[in-house]
C-alpha cells in the first residue's frame, strides 16, 4: 500500500511538471513573438512604452557623459580577435534621465585608444532597452579598480559612477557616433533568437512519468508471481 501511494504521488508530480512546462512553452512563444515585433518596429520614444521597458526599440536624444566609460568584458566570435570589451557609457537625455548605453565592441589591444570615443555633443541614439544583469555566483566580481566589468548590474554601476541611473540600459544599433573603426557595431536582430526548450523539458517529465508506470507494472507482476508460487507449493504439500 505504501509503495502504491509513493508511486501515485511521484507520477502526479511528474505529470504536473510536464503540463507546467507546456504552459511555460506557450508563455515564452508569446514573449518571443512580442520581442520580435518590438525589434522590427520603428523606434519609439521612451515615454510611449506601455507594457514594461525591456526589449523595446527606442530613440533617445542627449549627450554622453565624459570620463564615465565602462569596459564590459565579452568575447566576440565574429572578430578575428576574440577577447575584448563592450564600450558602455552613461547618456544624459534631454529629459534629464541618465541611461547606460552599450555602444560597440573593441578588441583588447585597443583598450588605450578607445578613450577618444566619447564627446559631449548632442546625439540621437537608437537602440534596444535591456534589463539589468544579475550578479552570478560563478563569475568573479567586477574589477572596479581596472575598470573591467563582467556583469552590468545597474545598482552597482550607479554606486560606482555616482549617478542615478535608470533601471535598464540600451544596446545601441548601428555604428557608433564616434566613427572609430576600432569600435565595431552591435547587432540587435539576434536578441529574439532565444532558445525555447520547454517542449523538450515537458517531454522529459512525461517520459519519466511513463517510465515510472512501466517499472511499477513490471515490479507488481514479479511481486505477484513470487507471492503466488509459495502459496501454490503450500497447497501441494497439504494435499500430500
UniProtKB/Swiss-Prot annotation:
UniProt topology in membrane: Multi-pass membrane protein
Compartments reported by the entry: Cell membrane
One Pfam family of this chain: SURF1
Sequence intervals crossing the membrane: 7-23, 201-219
Q: Which UniProt keywords apply?
A: Cell membrane, Membrane, Transmembrane, Transmembrane helix
Output a single Gene Ontology CC term carried by this record. plasma membrane
Q: What is its main location?
A: membrane
* Family the UniProt entry places it in: Belongs to the SURF1 family.
Q: What is this protein called?
A: SURF1-like protein
